[in-house]
């Protein structure tokens, strides 16, 4: 038997190998023995760890001038991002892109709510009138998840406050037709505070009152805002919050189309304080989008333009040349999208990200992986291929902060979710030229051709729990790879220090759960 080498020579022996273990990104993407790749087709090989996960920075650039503390973006879909989603995305270090399947005035109002948001103050609470009933309160509790509702004379914000009703007032009340005035806490028994109070003082006042809600009123006793003890406890510290450097307001983006009336829409959004505009199209390489990019850069030079969607170098070059500051990558890869099936057009998402990012990185352009993101692993793979951010639609659709009501089936809570190419979205606003038809170039079609589906997704709870889980998961993944930041990850991939491995179908099965008769997959 031949003698083994001394263990002290292991590192020297390793140097004799001509190539590092695994594949470089060039080997992975530019091979000629396999078609396009998606996330489950490969893995990232582990590196060397000499730091703890908490030391990993996820700071990233989503566009030429916007840097965030996390790479998270919410998709401009009407069942994903409105003002509540955008507020909490920004508080947690990401940014929300408010959909445009609504009137320009409604969209601008949502942008304004995000910009005016101050942690803890609820500026658009649900408000009831004295004519509402106990049944109405119970319905709000079931569909919205809360029941502390102020009562005003006209049932609107800035109406004269007459009382407040909470879950304690109605939980044992059997007659659902009873007016809320018979069970509510009347105005004279309420503790309120005056408009203009600082959050710190209001917080202290709410704590001392030992109440769950604190109404904020003006000099005429009209309701102007509401404070919630639960929200205040959640909102005390957001160290990652995405804020502008000058005004310290939360950052927000919004989507528009490429029609002439979208220029009027953008004027309202800019007036509301928009930080970035996303030109929303399934196929971005069009004369319409190029013309729109040039017009925006000339008219609103301080607003970053995120263009797309693209999946090829040629598309990418066209939009960069027009002036795009960031690009969305993906065509037909979204969970609610059937473009590849119906149109036979698109590209596997991993290959699309790698090809676009390789070209766009030469120009300092943000690259946003948009579609196909189902878990933390997919995010890590997107970022390792050159993406600087990930956009989530279906992954966020079931959260508390997404628009829409809850549905309960067989004891499980769901929320509605639909692709913007679905028939439901195309017909949802009752307006022929809505955001969905514009996105898929079908405004003038007599017959609709769906490129998406609609349905229900399981309730995921609050973004306040879900996004920190994603953030921590990414930190641990980068630790396994051996890189301390996203910039370091991209640099290590470019230098071929980070290595990859293709997976066979059997290898994919091996990486899945095996051997259990039953199991619970609890992620956080």
Swiss-Prot record:
Source species of the chain: Schizosaccharomyces pombe (strain 972 / ATCC 24843)
Listed EC numbers: 1.1.1.205
Pfam family membership, one: IMPDH
Residue positions of the active site: 337 (thioimidate intermediate), 439 (proton acceptor)
Residues annotated as binding NAD(+): 280-282, 330-332
Known catalytic reactions: IMP + NAD(+) + H2O = XMP + NADH + H(+)
Binding residue positions for IMP: 335, 370-372, 393-394, 417-421, 451
HAMAP family xref list: IMPDH (MF_01964)
Record gene name: gua1
Entry GO MF terms: IMP dehydrogenase activity; metal ion binding; nucleotide binding
Domain CBS, residue spans: 121-180, 184-242
Subcellular location: Cytoplasm
Protein's UniProt name: Inosine-5'-monophosphate dehydrogenase
GO biological process entries: GMP biosynthetic process; GTP biosynthetic process
NCBIfam families named among the record's database cross-references: IMP_dehydrog (TIGR01302)
Keyword Lyase: no
Gene Ontology cellular-component terms listed: cytoplasm; cytosol
